[in-house]
């Protein structure tokens, strides 16, 4: 999903999953 892609991008940038990502 788009949300999953955004989560992966953010995770790659900050090195951890954002709180709104499973």
From Swiss-Prot:
It is found in: Secreted. Disulfide bonds join 7-21. Expressed by the venom gland. Keywords: Disulfide bond, G-protein coupled receptor impairing toxin, Mast cell degranulation, Secreted, Toxin. GO terms for cellular component: extracellular region. GO terms for molecular function: toxin activity. It comes from the Eukaryota. The keyword Disulfide bond applies. Belongs to the sylv/frat/paul family. Potent mast cell degranulating peptide without hemolytic activity. Shows potent histamine releasing activities on rat peritoneal mast cells. Its mast cell degranulation activity may be related to the activation of G-protein coupled receptors in mast cells as well as interaction with other proteins located in cell endosomal membranes in the mast cells. This is Sylverin. It comes from Protonectarina sylveirae. The lineage of its organism: Eukaryota, Metazoa, Ecdysozoa, Arthropoda, Hexapoda.
């Amino acid at each position: 999903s788009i949300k999953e892609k955004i989560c992966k991008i953010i995770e790659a940038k900050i090195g951890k999953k954002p709180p709104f990502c499973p």
